[in-house]
Amino acid sequence: MATKSSIHIKPCNIASSEAHNRRTAEYMRNIGESRIYVVPELSTDNEQWINPDFGTPELRTHYDNIKQMVKEKTGRAMQEKERERKGKNGKIIKVAGCSPIREGVLLIRPDTTLADVRKFGEECQRRWGITPLQIFLHKDEGHWLNGQPEAEDKESFQVGNRWFKPNYHAHVVFDWMNHETGKSRKLNDEDMATMQTLASDILLMERGQAKLSQVKSIWNEMISSLRSRKPNCNV
């Protein structure tokens, strides 16, 4: 069955994001074959794009620059941690901390190009003001099959003597801030639904509700080897 388009967005965890997306040597040492299936010989098919307009390829530096921008624009420090406040009815309400950098996992086709995903990112920026900072296409992740694939499985292929089912996806890292006001962009449920449709239209895929099991496995893989580290960004 063909993969349907979907994008699932979460607050960015800078430490695990960059290590996973860039396939750093440390990350590859940490993951271990039993915890994540990345096939190194397929990694040459991966592609990446870094937005040149922000002057730094490092998310940590960009995050710090956002904190400074928020302070200059609003006169207040950026609220990074979850906090509590009392509502009008006296009940305690938890308020999430600011998530200035967010990351989307976008399911793609085997022949999806970097240009396709860049077009998606550019359209998101035009419509909602969220700016793509980094884009990574990953075509080296998936899982090994126990034996041969089913007859209807047209995606799995052989690597050596084993059959591999790929999980083609892209990571799109967004700056979620309005740099004129120093405030976070606000997207509602309708906006997010429109984004799903936008992905299917641009990537020429059938629109689908996020296949959460597939998307969650990607997130879990991304943080599994770095679980002991403290995130640099709220998740």
Which functions belong to the PLM regions below?
Residues 1-235:
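N-terminal nicking endonuclease/strand-transfer module with a His-rich metal-binding environment
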